[in-house]
């Protein structure tokens, strides 16, 4: 949770919550800030390449790990803070995060099943307008392998899933 002072353009405060705390404790974060105009940005489950700061809010990007994203939460609001105000706002799901279920069958006669993977070429990031950005990259989710059944299966989340996206099995 990031607070930006809109008058100075500087970051006022940030708070990090664990996923468990966020999902189980509705009062997980309380903070007191002085009167002023603030931009409030909330992010969760973002990749190491994500960039959020007062200087780059216009072109900040949210990236995802190569194994696919967890469900991604994001919200951005601007509000005046007055003495005695109490804020409550919900963190929304990105509209363009898709869950992809993968089941690959027919691999019973393959000796080296661990050498195979499922891959999806997709955008590397989303911007604050919830639009795909950055170059394409190969997402390789971790799949469970069952050599006896000759299958690989699992689920992962991806930020953007165009209908003509190439799927790679290598």
Regions found by a protein language model. Name each.
Residues 92-107:
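A short, Gly/Thr-enriched small/hydrophobic beta-strand-prone motif that recurs across taxa
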Residues 20-23, 47-88:
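Structured interaction patches on ligand/partner-binding surfaces of diverse proteins
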Residues 15-18, 66-67, 75-80, 92-95, ...:
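Short linear motifs at secondary-structure transitions and domain/linker junctions
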Residues 2-50, 113-170:
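Tryptophan-paired
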Residues 109-111:
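Short helix-loop capping/hinge motifs at secondary-structure junctions, enriched
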Residues 28, 88-90:
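Catalytic micro-motifs at enzyme active sites that drive phosphoryl/nucleotidyl and oxygen chemistry
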């Amino acid at each position: 949770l990031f607070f930006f002072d809109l008058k100075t353009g500087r970051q006022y405060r940030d708070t990090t919550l664990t996923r468990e705390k966020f999902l189980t404790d509705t009062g997980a974060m309380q903070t007191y800030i002085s009167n002023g105009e603030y931009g409030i940005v909330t992010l969760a489950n973002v990749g190491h390449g994500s960039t959020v700061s007062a200087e780059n809010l216009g072109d900040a990007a949210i990236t995802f790990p190569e194994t696919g994203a967890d469900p991604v939460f994001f919200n951005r609001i601007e509000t005046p803070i007055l003495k005695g105000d109490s804020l409550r706002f919900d963190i929304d799901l990105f509209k363009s995060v898709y869950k992809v279920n993968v089941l690959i069958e027919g691999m019973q006669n393959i000796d080296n099943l661990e050498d195979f993977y499922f891959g999806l070429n997709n955008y590397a990031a989303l911007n604050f307008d919830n639009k795909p950005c950055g170059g394409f990259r190969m997402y390789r989710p971790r799949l469970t392998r069952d050599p006896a059944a000759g299958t690989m299966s699992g689920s992962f989340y991806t930020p953007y899933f165009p209908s003509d996206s190439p799927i790679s099995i290598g």
